Structures are given as structure tokens and as C-alpha cells.
Curated annotation (Swiss-Prot):
Organism of derivation: Enterococcus faecalis (strain ATCC 700802 / V583)
PROSITE patterns per record: L_LDH
Modulation of this protein's activity: Allosterically activated by fructose 1,6-bisphosphate (FBP).
Protein residues bound to NAD(+): 21, 42, 47, 72, 86-87, 125-127, 150
Modified residues (Phosphotyrosine): 227
Protein name as catalogued: L-lactate dehydrogenase 1
Length: 327
């Protein structure tokens, strides 16, 4: 039995990386009453101590929780370890540009966590997330079900929100996915996008006041949203923090929720040996099932192109990494 399948009454999360994303995620755990114990790890120990103290002052307004500056030894009985640590994405830099800097960091962190005796679930959010989820799986030796990336969860939320604003409907009643890489080769699954069960094209047809040209161009704003935010404020962190909190809740509460995440494919969508954004059912065991929704020919081509781009980077990055390790 994994740690994640153990004591449901005391849920323990360890966060590795107390930067903008990590601290925002910890704040979301506190305000949403998720988990009973939250440990924060970072090379900047005074920062983790300060954040833990600051967050503890909110507990009288939320719910009891143990929050503290943790060490890697504290991972041994955690249900979930969330990885946000890594080199930040700079203005003009793609997520894939980050891979060479972050692979080494990832290996050091993951092997240290595994050495602690950790036997729960890894949730990866550091970018490029699909590649670092794959490397976490490789370096940990864990089953694929217990290594999950945030994938296109935030991209899909941005997509739903953008559609909602255009058609003037609550985003919670818009159902739509962005699949593929969390990055430049991601793509919208328009063929399954719907508002309250009505296919998006039917909705537009029935509501002539909806700007069709704006609908067509909507995805590009979604795809490039991170670059826009980074240019304006230096980093994105609130959206992904809440996405991570949602994933955490689904895992710890054994929800069997369907979310678009970076998951390992074994034949689904015609892909193998890759972590990439796809819908999956998740619960306390991790990934219960990858859902293969039927794509149009054009969408399938985009999935294949996205997977090919990721695999090319993975192969190049790992070859370089292994060569450096062998020196």
C-alpha cells in the first residue's frame, strides 16, 4: 500500500520549491482547507521559515493545520510531494529552453526524496513540465501512475475562461480541453468543446451575437497567455497554484476526478513512452485511467506533432545530460 493510500484522516503534503508558484500553492492549501500537514522545502531556509510562520497566522480564519519549514527526511511519510523547484522562465524564453538547466536540479531533488523512503505520489509543476515529469518518473523508478504533471490543466482553465467571457456564461459550465505539450505545441480540442452540453459550434450558431472571428483567434491568446503575463509581471503563479490545489484535492480526497494532466501514454493517442497533456481520472492511487477522447484528423496530427517535439527535446536533453554525468 502506498503512503497515498494510507491514513485518510491525516493528509500530508510536502512542497519542494518556495518561489512564487510554491508559496502561492501553499497559500491555496491553507485558504482551501486542503491537507492537515504541509511541509515546505527550499534552499532558502529562512524564506521557508518565514512563509510557514506567515501562513500559520491565517489558520485561525481557516482550519487547523501543521505548517513548517521541512527537510527531505520529512518526505518519508508524505502522501504527496509537489515539485515546483527549478530555474525560472525568463522573458522571451520558451519552457523547452529550460530543460537543460532543470534536469540536473530535478535529479538531485527526486533521488533525495526517494532515499528518504517516500512512497506516495509525485506531482510535478516545474517547467518544462512534461519533460520534468518524465525525468521524475525515470529518476524515481516509481510506477507511472504515481508520477503526475500539472500538464495542460491551467491551459484548459484559461481556454474555458476565455470561451466563457466570449459567450457570457459561467466558466464552470464550459467544458473544453487543451491537450499536448504544456507550451508552444499545445492545441485546442474544439471538436469536444461545449457549453452546458451544447457543442461550441452549435452554441455560436444559436447565438449570432457571438463574435466568430474572436472565437477563432481565442486559442492563440490562451496559448500565449504565460508569455503575456511574464512580460507584464515577470512570472505566472496564481493560476498554476490554484490548479495544483485542485489536483491535490482530487488526489487526497480520492475523487476520481477527470483533469487534463501530464500523464504517461502507452498507446493512447498513438503515443508511447512519453508524458504529455491528456485527460485522466485521478484519485488516491494517482492516475486511475487515461481517457482517450476521439480526435479529428487535424487534432490527431497536432497531438502527433506536439509529441514529436517533446520527444526530440527529451532525447537530445537526456543524451547531453547522460554524457555530462559520465564525465
Amino acid at each position: 500500500m502506498t503512503a497515498a493510500a494510507g491514513n485518510k484522516d491525516h493528509q500530508k503534503v510536502i512542497l519542494v520549491g518556495d518561489g512564487a508558484v510554491g508559496s502561492s500553492y501553499a497559500f491555496a492549501l491553507v485558504t482551501q482547507n486542503i491537507a492537515q500537514e504541509v511541509g515546505i522545502i527550499d534552499i532558502n531556509v529562512p524564506k521557508t521559515e518565514g512563509d510557514a510562520l506567515d501562513l500559520s497566522h491565517a489558520l485561525a480564519f481557516t482550519s487547523p493545520k501543521k505548517i513548517y519549514a521541512a527537510t527531505y527526511d520529512d518526505c518519508h511519510d508524505a502522501d504527496l510531494v509537489v515539485l515546483t523547484a527549478g530555474a525560472p522562465q525568463k522573458p522571451g524564453e520558451t519552457r523547452l529552453d529550460l530543460v537543460h538547466k532543470n534536469l540536473k536540479i530535478n535529479k538531485e531533488i527526486v533521488t533525495t526524496i526517494v532515499d528518504s523512503g517516500f512512497n506516495g505520489i509525485f506531482l510535478v509543476a516545474a517547467n518544462p513540465v512534461d519533460i520534468l515529469t518524465y525525468s521524475t518518473w525515470k529518476f524515481s523508478g516509481f510506477p507511472k501512475e504515481r508520477v503526475i504533471g500539472s500538464g495542460t490543466s491551467l491551459d484548459s482553465a484559461r481556454f474555458r475562461q476565455a470561451i466563457a467571457e466570449l459567450v457570457d456564461v459561467d466558466a464552470r459550465n464550459v467544458h473544453a480541453y487543451i491537450l499536448g505539450e504544456h507550451g508552444d505545441t499545445e492545441f485546442p480540442v474544439w471538436s469536444h468543446a461545449n457549453v452546458a452540453g451544447l457543442q461550441i459550434y452549435e452554441w455560436v450558431k444559436n447565438n449570432p451575437d457571438v463574435d466568430e472571428e474572436a472565437m477563432v483567434n481565442l486559442f492563440f491568446n490562451v496559448r500565449d497567455a504565460a508569455y503575456t503575463i511574464i512580460e507584464k509581471k515577470g512570472a505566472t503563479f496564481y493560476g498554476i497554484a490554484v490548479a495544483l490545489a485542485r489536483i491535490t484535492k482530487a488526489i487526497l480526497n480520492d475523487e476520481n476526478s477527470v483533469l487534463p494532466l501530464s500523464v504517461y501514454l502507452e498507446g493512447e493517442y498513438g503515443q508511447n513512452d512519453i508524458y504529455i497533456g491528456a485527460p485522466a481520472i485521478i484519485n488516491r492511487q494517482g492516475v486511475k485511467q487515461v481517457i482517450e477522447i476521439p480526435l479529428t484528423d487535424a487534432e490527431q496530427e497536432k497531438m502527433e506533432a506536439s509529441a514529436s517535439a517533446l520527444k526530440e527535446v527529451i532525447e537530445t536533453a537526456f543524451a547531453k545530460f547522460e554524457a555530462e554525468e559520465a564525465k
